[in-house]
Amino acid sequence: MKEGEIFGLLGPNGAGKSTTMEIIETLRKKTSGKVIVDGIDLDTDPGKIKKIIGVQLQTSGFYPGLTLLELIALFSGLYNQPVNAYELLELVNLQEKAKSKYKEMSGGQKQRFSIATTLINKPKIIFLDEPTTGLDPQARRNLWDLVRSIRDKGTTVIITTHYMDEAEQLCDRVAIMDEGKIIALQTPDKLIDDLVASGFEKPKITKAANLEDVFIQLTGKDFKDD
């Protein structure tokens, strides 16, 4: 994985995506191989790796009765890292929800907040495990914009997803895994071009738009995810 890119891990269920992520995140012991994160060897100094990464919590990892400000203060204390909560919330367009309770957030807002918490310790790398699962099309695209903005500020993003359109639109490079092994590693465009060059064909789609485009055109507003 290269510094400053959005890197996607793709594969069917059971391929090893989440296991690979958990090993790199120091949450699971590896059985073989070597893991180097920003020049740090996982075997010799996992503590240093923990200091430079941010891991997205699932929605069940937050206290529902606390406000967003209270949750940020909690995580800031755990990391022993002072943070301007309003600036952090502004980054994910939740500044107006600062004093709202977590349980009052919509699905898209909860996902954006969970990404915000990965940035509290100012990490070099963040890990997002299927961050758009369950979101409507507009909320998904808004989250893509957020992930790109984080990448553009210099943070490396590692993401797993089952949505191939998401990987194609969002990722600079992807690794396709199957049965615990990487079977392809390249940019989405290069993988597609190689497949076409091999003689692959499918019926051409003649319409210039699809139902998702209609949905977003009719309902879409910036960060509309209620």
Predicted regions and their residues:
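ABC ATPase "signature
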Residues: L185-Q186
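Conserved catalytic motifs of ABC-family nucleotide-binding domains
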Residues: K122
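Conserved ABC ATPase signature
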Residues: K101-M105
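Catalytic Walker B motif of ABC-type/P-loop ATPase nucleotide-binding domains
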Residues: I126-E130
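Conserved ABC ATPase "signature" region
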Residues: A73, G77, P82-K97
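Conserved ABC transporter NBD signature motif
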Residues: G33-D41, K48-I49
